[in-house]
Curated annotation (Swiss-Prot), chains A, B:
A molecular function (GO) term: RNA binding
Keyword Isomerase listed: yes
Subunit structure: Homodimer.
Protein name: tRNA pseudouridine synthase A
Function, as annotated: Formation of pseudouridine at positions 38, 39 and 40 in the anticodon stem and loop of transfer RNAs.
Enzyme class: isomerase
Gene3D superfamilies named among the record's database cross-references: Pseudouridine synthase I, catalytic domain, C-terminal subdomain, Pseudouridine synthase I, catalytic domain, N-terminal subdomain
Organism name: Akkermansia muciniphila (strain ATCC BAA-835 / DSM 22959 / JCM 33894 / BCRC 81048 / CCUG 64013 / CIP 107961 / Muc)
Domain of life: Bacteria
Length: 265, 265
């Protein structure tokens, strides 16, 4: 067996999220069926993490182990798989990696982008791809709010619980570091970009929702700063933005080991 | 009854085209159900023309007659209807017009845009929105080819037959005038824009297909020019581009009567 690291882009609208489910209508299920068809045997793939139903990706990463009978040049893998995939899922890159590589455990960070549309009437081509916020709000305050998330914080107020957390929840369980934030405006769209070492369940959507509540004047920047820097046990983000606008842009790995262009094997 | 002119945008992917069909899965059917629900009585709408299955619109125009019980300000019509429509169809503009206005017969021209993607791997968000032509071809020759269509020509070679044409086909039946053409490139996308006084069935897709055959060297510009300017009875465009990349951008009406901003009534 040889381990391969794949990069995938997908339109999340037709799928029930990344993670395999009994009904088989998830991105992982569709990818595993393509691999299994190609290999003639059941194949499991391992993603860098889940994306929720309706969330998109331009740079999701996963790994799979290919039988030695399928040792083709790395740059032939995308086409070999894309012919077996619906057009809403594309493999954009593949490279052979050492057996110690793991898409989830080797990752050092992720970049997400959230798209908000300010159009008076949502463009039908943005349906499911942008959060429609046509009423008055301030992009300037949104930007100030988003930058408050930078740094290492206890993100308790910006984490939804999956229900499988250890009890009592250990000290530092919700601590994460946001290394970069950016707000950019292009026509009717406002794009928020978050890069961090790790993200909690629904964290980007809860940060975006809270920042937008500040931008439309429902909470102050001071109140938001307290949620971020000194949360009380019951503090919660005032709003969770919908999945529509969210795209996983990139998963980061240590450059020295897995450069985008460098062939390991 | 009061006549209203509506402008609509739609993502054509989920629909079997504009024109009403028994199954009810067309844009016209969905719109008529929204009007009928609002009026409490069956309502027919009249489009500027058909768009085929999978073809999109940013500026389709149609008219409808509203009962006098529904005389609301023109700028309230889009929201009143959009709440009853799927997000892939949006009413973007409405205005009251004189009873003599007809979306089809009053139109003086249309503008269509065709989108080609040159990306090595088609972006999953472009699936159904662009024609994927990743192999080598010349945007420069495409542009020269597209401009050959300007002017008044017998477009016999660029018309698909619907089967309901008069026989024998009258002299001049396929004569049309293309008033403007444009080719623009943005990143991986090449956009071709055609404005004309009228378009035959599949004409934009047949022009685009032929221009692309020239751009990839399958026919010469001289051969294309002959198809346009001196077609023989059996001449046909060498290729019909798929519906995916096609968008009806605008329907033109005499400015003096129906300006976009001018309220008639």
């Amino acid at each position: 067996m040889t381990r391969i690291r794949f990069t995938a882009a997908y339109d999340g609208r037709p799928y029930l999220g990344w993670q395999s489910q009994p009904g088989g209508r998830t991105v992982q299920d569709v990818l595993e069926r393509a691999f299994s068809g190609l290999f003639g045997t059941t194949c499991r793939i391992h993603g860098s993490g889940r994306t929720d139903a309706g969330v998109h990706a331009l740079g999701q990463v996963f790994h799979a182990d290919a039988p030695d009978t399928h040792r083709i040049p790395a740059d032939k893998w995308p086409a070999a798989l894309n012919t077996r995939l619906p057009r809403t899922i594309r493999i954009t890159h593949a490279e052979y990696v050492p057996p110690g590589f793991h898409a989830r455990f080797s990752a050092t960070g992720k970049t997400y982008r959230y798209c908000i549309s300010r159009a008076p009437i949502l463009n039908p081509f943005d349906a499911g791809l942008a959060w429609h916020r046509p009423l008055a709000w301030s992009v300037d305050i949104l930007e100030q709010a988003v930058h408050l998330f930078r740094g290492t914080h206890d993100f308790t107020a910006f984490a939804a619980l999956r229900g499988n957390e250890p009890r009592p929840i250990p000290e530092g369980y919700f601590r994460r570091t946001i290394t970069q934030t950016q707000v950019a405006q292009t026509g009717e769209h406002v794009f928020i970009t978050f890069t961090g070492t790790g993200f909690l369940y629904k964290m980007v959507r809860l940060m975006t929702g809270a920042a937008h509540e500040a931008a439309r004047g429902k909470i102050t920047l001071e109140e938001l700063a307290r949620l971020i820097n000194a949360p009380l046990p019951d503090d919660k983000s005032p709003f969770c933005a919908p999945p529509d606008g969210l795209t996983l842009m990139r998963v980061h790995y240590p450059e020295e080991t897995f450069g985008d262009k460098k062939k390991i094997n």
